[in-house]
Amino acid sequence: MTYINSYKGQDWLLPTSIKQMISDKHICFFVEEFVDSLDFTNFDMIYEGAGHPAYHPRIIMKIIIQGMLSKERSSRKLSGACRENLVFIYLAEKVQPNFRTIARFRKNNGKFIKEVFKETVDLASDNGLVDLNMICTDGSKIKANSSKKMFLKKEQIERLDSIIDKMIEEDIKQDEIDKEIYGEKEENITDIEIKNLKGIVKSYREIKNKEKLKENCKRAVEEFDKDALIKRVSLSDPECRMMKNKKGVFELDYNTQFTVDSKNQIIVANDVCKDRTDTFQLQPQINNVRENITLNEDTKIVADCNYNNGENLKFLEEEKLNGYIPTISQAQKLDDKKQKKEDDYEYDWDKDEIILDGTRLKFHALWKHRGNKRQRWYKSEDGRIVRRVPEFFRERLRMKKKLETKEGKKIYSLRKTIVEPVIGNIKYNLGFTEFLVRGLDGAKLELNIASISHNLKKIWVARGRIGKNNEVIVFDLIIKNNQMNCDPTCKNKLLTNIPFFMHKQIKHYL
């Protein structure tokens, strides 16, 4: 057996192109093409004027997106990849941005990154990958960048705040003492030696950014004022909350929300919230979808039982949206789980009466019971039997009836194959199981980057499927072009009817 010849010297007569060393089927070329099509003119005003030239935001954006696709999210790892990884060297155009540059760009451009996510939705829609026949919403908890050791009560934080004040006072006094000690210059000690001496003394002290810690204490106390239900707050990230994940483990998390189109699993809306449940997230998600893309009149909106809230169902009916959200017992039945006990009454829609064990109860009043949400009170004629039901129980009954039909069951069963695989892809294929940036705004920013990467990969895969029929498409275009007598304006009109990623391949035929 002989071995393949290798070349340890690795010398080339002529330097090879980095692009040629990457597979022509690599997704990085699609990332490059997409980012190059974005508008970066707003950054020109930021970077204009005197000073050291800045890295073009186009380059940093390519690095961040490719990093998410390659499961490399840390700014330090991305900076290292720009020196060691051929794909990143190619996308970085042979420059090597510092990790601080990457982290600073990511931190300071949340609005721009959100607009880029909208661009991916528009791109998918323009290429026929989104039809909005059905959208599915679901939530998933993702671990925050915070430690349980810093999860403190309000009294503990206030006590810590007072301790920090004393430490700052001591530091001020120590600085005055240092000035007296180091200010008296001796003949045998030079300025450099005094500077070294200061460093030695400083190394023996406990070094902490007390001002930053004090600011965190202030933010943590503000969170108690915003949310009266919480008893503890994380000092390192006051906006995250203690939540129970699917494994039954309590950890500091953020609740992420995804709304996915059924045709190609394109994410059309996302969000991050501090709520422990998904109950109040349906309306914000639908509003987010409307900001990104226009909903059809007959769009089916599917969500699990966690979104079955009276206000949500009322909202769907008022907006004339076709919702499919089961009750807890219906969801358990569809999932072959032990069912929760159902209500034991019937409802007469014509007379607005409840039938309980053969006795008819008439509507009496709409009241609040012990400070809870408003309830509808039904009472028998003799006043001996009273039944309280939720204010929007009729909307619940209509939704329940819809989910009991054969069509309703079939539509709801598709939810698992639409939105849940998307969450699984983001968490496990992209490695997005924990936030790196702290704060709610930082979490939203990171989720947008993950959604951009997911959508681009879906479009790239669809590009491969379209590519199988390219010969037929090109043949049809040549015929149309000949019929147009090669008029340049007609060529442009022709190109607008096909996906942008096929333009380069087709232009040389026209």
Where are the language model's segments positioned?
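A short, ordered amphipathic alpha-helix with a cationic face
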Residues: 4-8, 52-54, 89-90
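Anion-binding and metal-coordination hotspots
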Residues: 3-6, 64, 71-84, 95-510
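Basic, short loop/linker segments at the boundary and entry of helix-turn-helix/winged-helix-like folds
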Residues: 24-65
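Amphipathic alpha-helical interaction elements
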Residues: 19, 23, 69-70, 94
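Hydrophobic alpha-helical membrane-insertion signals
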Residues: 1-29
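Short helix-loop boundary/capping segments at the starts of domains
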Residues: 36-44, 69-73, 84-91
